[in-house]
Amino acid sequence: MKGKKKVKEPAGMNIPEIFAALAMLEKERGIPQTFMMDKIIQAVTTAYKRDHKDVENVIVDVDEEHQRLKMYVQKNVVAEEDYVDPFNEIPVEEAKTISARYEIGDVVNIPVDNTEFGRIAAGNGKQVIIQGLREAERGMVYDEFNSKQHEILTGVVTRIDPRTNAVSLRIGTGTESTEALLLSGEQVPGEELVEGQHVKVYVVDVRRSTRGPQILISRTHPGLVKRLFELEVPEIYNGTVEVKSIAREAGSRTKMAVWSADENVDPIGACVGPKGQRVAAIVDELRGEKIDIIKWSEDPAQFIAAALAPSDVVDVMMAEEGKACRVIVPDDQLSLAIGKEGQNARLAARLTGYKIDIKPESYQGEDDEEIVDEEPVQ
């Protein structure tokens, strides 16, 4: 009978620096050690199989107590006459020299040479940890800014692309700061930004990407106006006054509908502030953009009439079906109601959600002429 074959167990890779790094990641960045160790195991397994393409099954054993890693190639125990694949099979007689308990169909773990495994583990472990740090930082930045969606943040202009006019902003501080790009289409027309300038922006969305979180910001979004009013008007911040809707053409004019359930509170007066100070501060921040504050009404006709300010309204006739209406205004205020290049009517339509057909008081249309909702308001 053959003597039992002594197969030396691998001493394993004593890599305390890897374990220490994983402990640091868990403590300081909140990344579980088990999560990172799984990534290291996956990386070293992939690397070994890349160098040994014929090997099918490899496992890595983690000895946390002694801070060691051990790698084994798994081989199936087969009969002598069926033995054809030395990379993935071991004859039963050879297996029994390792341990008499092995039978055909069992799996034997064959230790991988320490020197080779050490080279693979050290290199791949380091790369995984570096990548883990990057992912942790990206994750922290994403979590930080994802919680600030639809909020206002202040950024510092760091660069302006002379070709696209896109503005790079540094938002946040320290490890949780990141670059955000203010595209030309999200900039207020006519507004000139310069490097070093502090700028308030509205966070439209935060997305994950392979290069880190992408923060989509805007200076033209109606949400910027709403958040600015929340900062300036305590009654909006605490919910006493509610912003019902906003229509905006950035850099030119905004219409905002407000309402309060408290009959003792004037929602328009609260937004304007003493001597107009509150609204003036927002106009300054928006570089002179005009702001019309409208009192919202659950009666569509009243709301539409108010939305067409500063024009007076004689009558509002609602369509029987759909969201459309015809508004009659004094002849001498037709141009005022429509506004320059149709802006006043356009903003009123967006604010109310109704298609508005404006006619002068001298309009001679048929009394029963149908009001048609021809197209949705954009």
Describe each region flagged by the PLM.
Residues 1-378:
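RNA-contacting regions in translation and RNA-metabolism proteins
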